[in-house]
C-alpha cells in the first residue's frame, strides 16, 4: 500500500484535476513542527492565547492583575501564567479576572474601581447596620399632632362655637339699626358668626369620629373661617378709623375685634395641625431601616466580563477550546494523529488529506472517485515538495 505524505504549509507541486478545489489553511503550521511529538502540534497563536493543550485553554491579556482576597491584595506580574488542571479554563481580561473551575465561578475586578458594577459572589450578601429602627412621626418631633387633634380640638371647637354665637348676638342688637356703620352694613357679624359655628361643630365632631371625610371637612371649614376672620378684622379696623361713626358703634365694633383675632388664631392652628395629622396618618406605619449592602467586587450576571454573555466567553468566543480557530479536534492540521497527516491510500474521502469536510484540500465526493489515476501520478511530486519544505517524519512509512 502506497502512503502519501502532504505538508500543510504549501503544496505548489501537486497536479490536481480541474474539478478539485484547493483551499489554503487559515493558520499555517509554524516552522519546526517536525520536531514536535506526533501527538502535539504548535500553532502561531494570537497574544491572548498563552498555551493550548488538549482539553485546556488559558486565555489572558498581558498585564498586571490584582486579586482581592480575605487576607489582603495579591498582585501578579506581567506575563504571569497559572497552571490549571485538565478540563478547566482560565480567562483573564480587563478590568477583571475570570477563573473557571469545575462547578464554581470566581470573578474579581480591580480594587478601587468605582465604575465597575458591584457583584455578589456567590450570592447577595447584605450587612444591616446595627442601628435598625422603626420610627413614626413622633421620632422627629416631640409634638404629636394626632394626639393634639384627639384631645384639644374638642375644646377649640367649643370656643369657636361661642365666638360665633357672640357675633350673631351682636348682629341682632336693635340699637345698631339706629346708628348705621361699616360693620353692620357689611353683615360681618352674621356670616362670620355662622361660619365660626359650623367650623367649631365640625371640629368637635372630628374629635369624636376621626374619619377621613369628617376630618377633611373640618379642615376645609376652618380654612374658610380663618379667611372670614381676617376679613372681619379688616372691616372692624376700618370702622374704628372713621371719624363720623358714633361712640356706641365704635364700642360694639371694638368688642368684636378681640373675638375676631381669637377666631383667626384658632382656625389657623386647627387647620395647620389637622393637615399635619392627616399627612402623619398616611406614613404612620412606614418603617425606616437604614441597611448597608456589601458586595463582592464583580457581578456574575451584569458585569461587562460575564461568564455566560460577556465579551470573553469560553463557549462562544473567538478563542474557544471547542469551536474557535485554535481547535484541537477539527482544525485543518489534526493534533490527534500527527502534524503531517498520513493517509492509507492516495485518494480517501474520509481520512485522507483530500477531504471534503475537514481536510485542507476541499474535494467533492464524485470527482475524487473518477480521478484516482491522476492523483496517483502526482505522488512523486508531493514527496519532492515534502522533502524540500518539511523534513519527513521518521515515524511515517515510505
Swiss-Prot record:
One of its GO terms (biological process) is cell surface receptor signaling pathway. Its main location: membrane. Residues 319-331 have a biased composition (Polar residues). Pfam families: CD20 (PF04103). The keyword Secreted does not apply. It is a multi-pass membrane protein. One of its GO terms (cellular component) is plasma membrane. Residues 316-346 are annotated as: Disordered. Keywords: Membrane, Transmembrane, Transmembrane helix. InterPro entries: CD20-like, MS4A. The chain crosses the membrane at residues 156-176, 178-198, 218-238, 251-271. It is found in: Membrane. Residues 332-346 have a biased composition (Low complexity). This is Membrane-spanning 4-domains subfamily A member 18. It comes from Homo sapiens (Human). The lineage of its organism: Eukaryota, Metazoa, Chordata, Craniata, Vertebrata.
